[in-house]
Amino acid sequence: MNARRRGVWAVLLLAAGTAGAAPVLIDHRNVDVTRLTLPQIERAKASLHIAYGHTSHGSQLTDGMSGLVDFANGGGQGLALPENAFAWNQSGSDGALDLRDYALCDDVGYYPAWVDCTSNYLSDPAHSNVNVILWSWCGQMDDKYEAGTLTNEYLAPMAALERHFPHVAFVYMTGHVDIEDDADNKAACAAIRAWCATNDRILY
């Protein structure tokens, strides 16, 4: 892992409250925002430049982040941070986190389109400061697991992109609940989680 990627990982680790640990596996248990210090939040906003690709289900993440701004501004959980400490926008202007929502094509279920889109995006000089790529699933993850293509159409291409763009941190994601295909859905999530744990990756 090169120095630039280590630097990005360090910021993500601090933001996750798990400094010194690798891999970074974030789930529903990592929800105590009161553990974050203002210097950690400010460092993340100053250092992270994120491009996020998703369709409908992926908006839960950005909706939640917008809600977090209001939550913190209202002093939720006893927070006493400056106003809009968790603010984000498409450019990082006015001290906000640089999170380019819908920057990438569709979602990660569309292979090979998502791979080509990522490569083209990161190869564009206009995006040279982007150092985090985040892709969300819609409903295809369990289908890929059932078809035996989860590795070839998700895990392996992500690893290839990591090698091609070593200055970028790629955040892996599991999918949303799918009660109609619960077994394959859980198995796919477990496979992605195991891959990230074994290979020291970032998982959200």
Regions from the language model: what does each represent?
Residues M1-W9:
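Bacterial N-terminal signal peptides that target proteins for export
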Residues A16-T18:
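N-terminal signal peptide c-region/cleavage motif recognized by signal peptidases
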Residues L25-D124:
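N-terminal carbohydrate-binding/catalytic regions of secreted carbohydrate-active enzymes
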Residues T34-T37, P112-D124, T149-A160, A187-I192:
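Alpha-helical scaffolding within the catalytic cores
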Residues A46-H49, G74-L79, H127-I133, R163-V171, ...:
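Loop/turn elements at helix/coil->beta-strand transitions in domains of secreted/extracellular proteins
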Residues G64-G75, P157-H164, I192-I202:
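Structured segments of extracytoplasmic/periplasmic soluble domains
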Residues Y111-T151, G175-D178:
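Oxyanion-hole/transition-state-stabilizing segment in secreted/luminal serine hydrolases
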Residues G175-Y204:
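Substrate-gating cap/lid alpha-helix
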